[in-house]
Amino acid sequence: MNLKQLAGEYAANFVNDGMKIGLGTGSTVYWTIQKLGERVKEGLSFQAVPTSKETEALAQQLNIPLISLNDVQSLDLTIDGADEIDSNLQLIKGGGGALLREKIVASSSKKLIIIADESKLVTHLGTFPLPIEIIPFSWKQTENKIQSLGCQTTLRLKNNETYITDNNNMIIDCIFPNHISNPVHLHTQLKMITGVVETGLFISMTSTAIIGTKNGIKKL
């Protein structure tokens, strides 16, 4: 069993009968969803809000009951992955392109459980490119303003074409040469730029991190 599978399957144990949960997106959450599909076959009853079309399709294949976030006041918990996790449980997310929906669902949840393998633990955020979702209109102007904060930017592509999110937006991936020293301040600066929809910085949102390590599960 690989470390992503270890963390992903373990997190499925947090889901109990009657819960309303958020299901994240990515290669680690894939294992959570697979395990939850097995538990549905065994009789577990819960409802889930998917954070992407990819997750929605997988959940439907496994007969996991899906609901809209519009139909609930809050979710009991959300299980999602991360691209980087620092010692304060601040995150970079969005490598899979679903950061906006992931953040909306996470912010509507009583608990956010982050799952990852130990390679995602970092001292400072910023080695992994920070994704920023922007609207397509005048995207180059928005990119220039983002660059003025001191980062190198790349417009995300897929199959040599501009990557389009599930919300019909674009993603700019940003590298900060000296890492991200103050994630809270940077998030605020980015959100003040007109054209920026959301950032991949998840600040003070994580309740628990479940890390798959060579020595087993580690909880943060």
UniProtKB/Swiss-Prot annotation:
Signal peptide: none annotated. GO terms for molecular function: ribose-5-phosphate isomerase activity. Its EC number is 5.3.1.6. Keywords: Isomerase. Pathway: Carbohydrate degradation; pentose phosphate pathway; D-ribose 5-phosphate from D-ribulose 5-phosphate (non-oxidative stage): step 1/1. The active site is at E102 (proton acceptor). This is Ribose-5-phosphate isomerase A. It comes from Bacillus cereus (strain ATCC 14579 / DSM 31 / CCUG 7414 / JCM 2152 / NBRC 15305 / NCIMB 9373 / NCTC 2599 / NRRL B-3711). The gene is rpiA.
